[in-house]
């Protein structure tokens, strides 16, 4: 099979041009993929009023055996959010905030980990003694997921929340033991937790 990711032009159609047309039962007749460069249905001629050149990236890859996490989710996410790192060294400059640095940092240190492929961490924000974590199942399969937090985390309970970050009424917190917790996630479902 073939995987396709168009991060600059997410509006695509297969077999014939056009966006906004959906069918669960259509039989594909060709391998033609049309990408809507301007991501609209009105055919605005942007080149008439936006100067310069236009470019878009397309990533195409093949796979031998289909598995949504390995064939689609992981390769697409790697093209959208490539690995990045940051290095901090105090500068002594008056306009820069110089964080307290003492001791040595390890050469490597594991961060947040999930026990299954196809579930993405879409946000992890710490605020004082709390943190909000959002996970999204993208492979279309339900089941248990285990989150392992960074080594020195002090969180004890994960409370289910809605997409606004508000605790779900009557939902009991999930105990965090050995820096990890388990929860059930449905196909293509987002799950948000407040860690305390």
Please annotate each region the language model reported.
Residues 1-196:
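C-terminal (or distal) subdomains of carbohydrate-active enzymes
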């Amino acid at each position: 099979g073939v995987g396709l990711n168009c991060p600059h032009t997410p509006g695509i159609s297969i077999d014939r041009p056009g966006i906004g047309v959906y069918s669960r039962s259509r039989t594909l007749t060709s391998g033609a993929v049309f990408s809507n460069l301007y991501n609209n249905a009105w055919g605005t001629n942007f080149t008439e009023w936006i100067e310069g050149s236009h470019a878009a990236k397309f990533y195409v890859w093949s796979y031998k055996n289909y598995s949504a996490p390995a064939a689609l989710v992981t390769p697409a996410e790697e093209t959208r959010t490539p690995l990045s790192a940051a290095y901090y060294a105090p500068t002594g400059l008056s306009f820069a905030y110089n964080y307290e640095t003492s001791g040595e940092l390890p050469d490597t240190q594991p961060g947040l980990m999930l026990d299954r492929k196809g579930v993405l961490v879409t946000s992890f924000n710490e605020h004082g003694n709390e943190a909000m974590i959002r996970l999204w199942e993208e492979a279309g399969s339900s089941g248990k997921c285990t989150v392992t937090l960074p080594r020195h985390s002090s969180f004890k309970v994960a409370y289910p929340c809605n997409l606004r970050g508000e605790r779900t009424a009557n939902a009991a917190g999930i105990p965090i033991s050995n820096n990890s917790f388990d929860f059930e996630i449905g196909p293509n479902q987002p799950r948000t937790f407040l860690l305390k």
